[in-house]
Design a protein with these regions (language model features):
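Conserved PLP-binding active-site segment in aminotransferase class I/II-type PLP enzymes
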Residues: 1-74, 78, 100
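PLP-dependent aminotransferase-like
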Residues: 73-122
Length: 122
C-alpha cells in the first residue's frame, strides 16, 4: 500500500495572516473606487517604491513574470543572449528569459544566502 503525500506549490496563508490588517482595507478602497487598472493606488505605490529604492521612477507590474520580462527588455537582452540565473528559483525566471528568446544559464546558489554569488558563477 502506497501513501501519497501532496505538497502544496505555495502556501501563503501564514504570511497573509500577518499582513491581513494592512491588505484588506486597501483592497476595499480599490474595489470602492473601481480603479482596478492604474489609478491612484498604483501611482502611490510607484512613488513610494522609487523613493524606497532611490530611483527616479518605478513601474508597477501585473505580475513578477511581467516584471522579469520588462527588466530583460530594459537591459536590451536579445534572442540568443545568455542570462545567468539561479538554479534555485521559481519557474518564471527561466520562462521570462526563454520568452524573450535568450538562453538561461543556471548557476548554483550559496547554501546560506540562497543567492547566486561570484563564487557560484565562476
Amino acid at each position: 500500500m502506497t501513501v501519497q503525500t501532496t505538497v502544496p506549490l505555495l502556501d501563503l496563508k501564514m504570511q497573509y495572516e500577518t499582513l491581513r490588517h494592512e491588505i484588506e482595507p486597501v483592497i476595499k478602497d480599490i474595489c470602492d473606487s473601481q480603479y482596478f487598472i492604474l489609478g491612484p493606488k498604483v501611482a502611490e505605490f510607484e512613488t513610494e517604491m522609487s523613493a524606497s529604492v532611490g530611483t527616479k521612477r518605478a513601474l508597477g507590474c501585473a505580475s513578477g513574470s511581467d516584471a522579469l520580462l520588462l527588466a530583460l527588455m530594459a537591459l536590451d537582452v536579445k534572442a540568443g543572449d545568455e542570462v545567468i540565473c539561479p538554479s534555485y528559483t521559481f519557474f518564471a525566471t527561466g520562462g521570462a528569459i526563454r520568452r524573450i528568446g535568450a538562453v538561461p544559464v543556471w548557476a548554483d546558489i550559496d547554501p546560506i544566502s540562497y543567492n547566486v554569488t561570484s563564487a557560484t558563477i565562476a
